[in-house]
Amino acid sequence: MLSSALKLTKKVCSTKSNGLIRSFSTQTQSRDYAVVDHTYDAIVVGAGGAGLRAALGLTEKGYKTACITKLFPTRSHTVAAQGGINAALGNADQDDWRWHAYDTVKGSDFLGDQDAIHYMCKEAVPTVLELEQYGVPFSRMDDGRIYQRAFGGQSKNFGKGGQATRCCAAADRTGHALLHTLYGQAVKHNTKFFIEYFVTDLIMENGDCRGVVAINLEDGTIHRFRSHATVIATGGYGRAYFSATSAHTCTGDGNAMVIRAGLPCQDLEFVQFHPTGIYGSGCLITEGARGEGGYLLNSSGERFMPRYAPSVADLASRDVVSRSETMEIREGRGVGPEKDHCLLNLTHLSPEIIDERLPGIRETAMIFAGVDVTKEPIPVIPTVHYNMGGIPTNYKGQVITQVDGKDKLVKGLYAAGESACVSVHGANRLGANSLLDIVVFGRAVANEIENTLAKDTPHKPLPPNAGEESIANIDAIRFSNGTRSTAEIRLEMQKIMQRNAAVFRDGQVLKEGVELIDKCARSLINDLKTTDRTMIWNTDLIESLELQNLMTQAVLTMHSAEARKESRGAHAREDYKERDDANWMKHTLSYLDVNTGKVTLNYRPVVSETLDQSEMETIKPFKRVY
């Protein structure tokens, strides 16, 4: 409905602030805003794999559901996932979901919560079969069963039986196939989509989530969505870095909304570098290329991974392979005039195999590297790919905060996918566990809402000032009169993150990074210049809001990394080279006071107990080698 009576005060100018939200106290101009109000049982923010699976599940169950997305659903970044989705189907070889869980716990470097890992790996098989029934066009074996390929960090018989073949694939376009299928199912079940709406903030009341505020990009109108359940499924924040496989839309908007609401994010220091981003462009070359038999080379033409991972070589976990590449480059065995990258060789594979199983890779390599993969290797380099950290949740998707050192559920708020930290990935994600994560926990959220929310539950009125702070922030950005453009500040942030929170880290570099990123954040607040003052398709405004979101997470990532005095998974410190379970086998909870810029770090224990010890025993920590 259109609420013409609601008057929100527009605050144009601002005092300088050390925080990430401006302080509005110097000048104000009163202007009436006509705000469009909506009421739904549930709203889902984001329309990638997790968001669509949650929205589809909710509409299937009869809930009035809205899915709000800043871009068309099939442009969501899930579409770029290539390699596949893990499930112990046992089509290509004997397999067991417990072996999958073992590999996931080991891959997480024992920071993964074993109750959530238990749930995800057990649910993997029915989840993939459900996707098949929905219509995902998986590649097929000769007997008609779903094709499975080898992927990194995966084994049989709890690490004792050799390489597992567990990754279910639709050639090298699995994410594309999955996303289009889920979108079709969501449309079939009459999910209401609000496309090209940018969600700015959560609406909170007494610690509970009541909905969200959004901008309609087409006409600049403000919309308030009231709901009993709000699901955040907005993906990661890879674009905080200079070189990333992520789309430019991957700005972690949901994470930042949660942070602005005074809630924590978890384990943001763990950022995955994929071993095979194309040198120069950062475009992803799937791990499936190595699963099909590809291997890495240094400048001597040596296949070097057997030196670092004797048992599995190029199919070690991603953090191990990325560090190995970096060591080769550091020790002068890099390729090219600058000796700053490695090569991925596929030339020994037949063109028929490549065309059948890796057609997209052949095309991508030609477009972005000028390489015919049947004749020459692809230049590659470790590239930011995935955020293990995010919004802390339990395995049901309910968002967690801490009160007096104890976990507390945030009523009405859920998260799933890369924006969430369940935590099934811990300190390092295994390849092909991401598509599994988004579908399993997108469905889990819908199931939990069904268990806790009665249909036709009446809605309470929203707080009368709901949305005021969000609109004040929008106007503060629109009327910023500093000296630096959004693009200039964004580039500075990305280069700081690329340099100071990289594959290898140490205390001095991280301490410098904390100082630099805090200074960059202050520059965003105090010296931003925008030129478009309108509200209709104002890309200057939206990019600035996205930068604000990225900066929020970049600050917490750097502070969290500087504080963690150990090496674990993707967080590899040269001054603390060993994993320290006695002091650091715990999750980081990071808070940011957006008004003052103050960062607070707390910690919560890793869940080491499985859901059912008789079904799956706890996997105790051991030294992680491949």
Curated annotation (Swiss-Prot):
GO terms for molecular function: electron transfer activity; flavin adenine dinucleotide binding; succinate dehydrogenase (quinone) activity. Residues 1-24 form a transit peptide. The modification Tele-8alpha-FAD histidine is found at H77. Signal peptide: none annotated. SUPFAM superfamilies: FAD/NAD(P)-binding domain (SSF51905), Succinate dehydrogenase/fumarate reductase flavoprotein C-terminal domain (SSF46977), Succinate dehydrogenase/fumarate reductase flavoprotein, catalytic domain (SSF56425). The keyword rRNA-binding does not apply. It is a peripheral membrane protein. Its cofactor is FAD. GO terms for biological process: defense response to Gram-negative bacterium; mitochondrial electron transport, succinate to ubiquinone; mitochondrion organization; phagocytosis; positive phototaxis; tricarboxylic acid cycle. It is an enzyme of class 1 (oxidoreductase). It catalyses: a quinone + succinate = fumarate + a quinol. FAD binds at residues 46-51, 69-84, 253, 418, 434-435. It holds the Pfam family FAD_binding_2. It comes from the Eukaryota. Its EC number is 1.3.5.1. The active site is at R318. Pathway: Carbohydrate metabolism; tricarboxylic acid cycle; fumarate from succinate (eukaryal route): step 1/1. Substrate binds at H274, T286, H385, R429. Belongs to the FAD-dependent oxidoreductase 2 family. FRD/SDH subfamily. Component of complex II composed of four subunits: a flavoprotein (FP), an iron-sulfur protein (IP), and a cytochrome b composed of a large and a small subunit. PANTHER family: SUCCINATE DEHYDROGENASE 2 FLAVOPROTEIN SUBUNIT, SUCCINATE DEHYDROGENASE [UBIQUINONE] FLAVOPROTEIN SUBUNIT, MITOCHONDRIAL. NCBIfam families: sdhA_forward, sdhA_frdA_Gneg. Flavoprotein (FP) subunit of succinate dehydrogenase (SDH) that is involved in complex II of the mitochondrial electron transport chain and is responsible for transferring electrons from succinate to ubiquinone (coenzyme Q). This is Succinate dehydrogenase [ubiquinone] flavoprotein subunit, mitochondrial.
